[in-house]
Amino acid sequence: MGWEYGIKVADVKDIKVLMDRLAEALPRIDGYRMQRKKDGFILLQNNPDWPEALQVSVEEARNMEGLKDDEPYIYCLFHIGGEDAVKWRECMYRVLEEEECAAEWFEL
């Protein structure tokens, strides 16, 4: 599949703000475009066989260690690897470090 991560946010009210910050902070790289959705965003690439590069959305936990069932968290699925994905992941780490809300990055 790809790299899968979650972001647990201490206060559910902070999820939307954090999602917006993540979307705004990602470096713009030629060949990709962002599509905003109600529950997150997707970075699409110019590849008809595999258009999704990165998906970030709000999901509800089910049988996940460290989260209660139905607890919302931010789901991050990197459909691709390589240099571009590493740049996005590092940028997302920095956003979490800079944000005032309590958020924890974890690997799925």
Please state what every model-predicted region is.
Residues M19-E24, R28, H79, E83-L108:
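Acidic, proline/glycine-rich low-complexity IDRs
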Residues M1-I15:
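Terminal, regulation- and interaction-focused segments at domain boundaries
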Residues K13-E83:
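Short, intrinsically disordered low-complexity segments
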Residues I7-K8, M34, F41-L43, V56, ...:
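Hydrophobic transmembrane signal anchors and adjacent membrane-proximal interface regions, especially
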